[in-house]
C-alpha cells in the first residue's frame, strides 16, 4: 500500500493550503481538511477535500493551537492511523507538537520529500543546519509532518468538486496559554511562493536605507523582494515572512537575483531550485558564485542603480 487511507490537513496560512492539498492528493485516498471559517471550507473542497471540518467556538483570548485536543479526538474517531500535514510555520510546528503528543505519533518537521510504503511514511529533510539530508521512516500509526514551502506544487481549484462539511466544537484544554493582548504587525502582504522574479538582499546591501535600491529594481522588472535570514532575524531590516532559507521560504522562481548574499548552505537550500540565479557580491570568493548562473563582482550599492536604469528602458 503506497498511500494512507486518509490524510488530515490544516494550514494557518491560507496561501500554503493549495500545496498541502496537492500533497494530500498524492499521499492518501481520502482528504480531510480542518478550517477556521466557511470561506476556507469552500476553498478546501475546490482543492480536493472530501470532508471539511470547521473548527468553531474558540474564545478570542485563546490561540488556534488550543484546538489540538478536539482535532486529535476527531482524527482518532475516524481511523486508527493516518497522516497529518501542516505548514512549517511557527504555529504549524507548535500545533504539530501538540497533535503528536495527543496521537502518540512521530513528528517530523520541515519535510521536503515524502513517500509511503506499506502504510508508513518515509520523510526526508535537512539536518545539521542544511549540511546533510536526513531520512526517517515513521513507524507509529499516525504521522504528523510539517511541510517545507515549495515541496509540492499548488493544487488547482475546481469549482465543480463537492464534499461534506462538519463542525468541530471548541473544548477548552486542561492547560492553555491565554492571550492577553494582540499587536498588529506592520507587514505588506506578499506571496513569494508564487513570484516569477525575486530580488533578495543580504547584509552586503550595507544598511536598511539601501534596501530602497533593491525595491526600485523590483519595481522596474516586476519582481518581489526577499532577504536572507540575518537581514530579517538579526538586523530586523525586513519582516520574517520574507526571508529565504532552510527554516522558512523555499522558492522556485524563474529568476533569483541575490544582492549582497554570501551564499551559505542554509540560505541556498531555499533558493537553489530557482531556474536562474544571478549574484551581485563584492567578494569574488563568496560561496554564492558557486551556485550562480551569472554574477557580478562589485559593490551592490553602485551596481543596483545602473542595473535598474538599464532594465527600466
Swiss-Prot record:
Under the heading SMART domains, the entry gives: ETF
Q: Name one GO molecular function term.
A: electron transfer activity
Question: Which keywords has UniProt assigned to this entry?
Answer: Electron transport, FAD, Flavoprotein, Transport
One of this protein's GO BP terms?
Answer: fatty acid beta-oxidation using acyl-CoA dehydrogenase
Q: Where does FAD bind?
A: 255-283
* InterPro entries given in the database record: DHS-like_NAD/FAD-binding_dom, ETF_a/b_N, ETF_a/FixB, ETF_asu_C, ETF_asu_C_CS, FixB, Rossmann-like_a/b/a_fold
Listed pathway(s): Amine and polyamine metabolism; carnitine metabolism
Q: How does it assemble?
A: Heterodimer of FixA and FixB.
Similarity comment: family membership: Belongs to the ETF alpha-subunit/FixB family.
Q: What does this protein do?
A: Required for anaerobic carnitine reduction. May bring reductant to CaiA.
Matching HAMAP family: FixB
Protein name per UniProt = Protein FixB
Its gene is: fixB
Amino acid at each position: 500500500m503506497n498511500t494512507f487511507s486518509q490524510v488530515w490537513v490544516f494550514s494557518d496560512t491560507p496561501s500554503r493550503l493549495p500545496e498541502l492539498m496537492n500533497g494530500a492528493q498524492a499521499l492518501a485516498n481520502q482528504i480531510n481538511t480542518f478550517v477556521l471559517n466557511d470561506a476556507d471550507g469552500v476553498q478546501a473542497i475546490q482543492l480536493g477535500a472530501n470532508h471539511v471540518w470547521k473548527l468553531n467556538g474558540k474564545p478570542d483570548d485563546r490561540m488556534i493551537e488550543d484546538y489540538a485536543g478536539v482535532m486529535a479526538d476527531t482524527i482518532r474517531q475516524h481511523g486508527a492511523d493516518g497522516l497529518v500535514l501542516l505548514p512549517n510555520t511557527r504555529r504549524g510546528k507548535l500545533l504539530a507538537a501538540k497533535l503528536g503528543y495527543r496521537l502518540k505519533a512521530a513528528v517530523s518537521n520541515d519535510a521536503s520529500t515524502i513517500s509511503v510504503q506499506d502504510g508508513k511514511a518515509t520523510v526526508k529533510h535537512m539536518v545539521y543546519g542544511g549540511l546533510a539530508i536526513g531520512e526517517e521512516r515513521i513507524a507509529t500509526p499516525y504521522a504528523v509532518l510539517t511541510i517545507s514551502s515549495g515541496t509540492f506544487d499548488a493544487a488547482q481549484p475546481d469549482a465543480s468538486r463537492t464534499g461534506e462539511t462538519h463542525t468541530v466544537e471548541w473544548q477548552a484544554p486542561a492547560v492553555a496559554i491565554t492571550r492577553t493582548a494582540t499587536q498588529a504587525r506592520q507587514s505588506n502582504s506578499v506571496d513569494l511562493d508564487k513570484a516569477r522574479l525575486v530580488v533578495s538582499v543580504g547584509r552586503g546591501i550595507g544598511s536598511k536605507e539601501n534596501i530602497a535600491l533593491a525595491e526600485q529594481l523590483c519595481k522596474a522588472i516586476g519582481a518581489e523582494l526577499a532577504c536572507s535570514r540575518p537581514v530579517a532575524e538579526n538586523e530586523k531590516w525586513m519582516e520574517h515572512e520574507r526571508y529565504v532559507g532552510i527554516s522558512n521560504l523555499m522558492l522556485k522562481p524563474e529568476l533569483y537575483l541575490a544582492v549582497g548574499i554570501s551564499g551559505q548552505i542554509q540560505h541556498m537550500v531555499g533558493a537553489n531550485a530557482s531556474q536562474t540565479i544571478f549574484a551581485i557580491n563584492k567578494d569574488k570568493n563568496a560561496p554564492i558564485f558557486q551556485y550562480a548562473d551569472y554574477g557580478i563582482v562589485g559593490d551592490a550599492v553602485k551596481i543596483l542603480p545602473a542595473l535598474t536604469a538599464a532594465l527600466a528602458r
